[in-house]
């Protein structure tokens, strides 16, 4: 999740921060949307990586190259700007977990009448 105060509350949790750091150390997939990428930034996980977040939180992405893209994938880290990018964010996660095909899955879910 992202947004406030959710992101602030997640970052305040030692359990959450320890789990995120362990996942990063293990090379597992990390994904955050909206303001939540700032957690990765504050934990030092974005140094030398490309990342995006909700406008106004860019300075919190310590050491990252902020892209401003709707969704940015760099290695095992996926970040997204906000709720408007949620479908693309999900597709990027599917791509990582399935080895591709996320956009095809997204296309199948869309209503042709829209």
Residue ranges of predicted features:
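Active-site-adjacent pocket-lining segments in enzyme domains
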Residues: 1-114
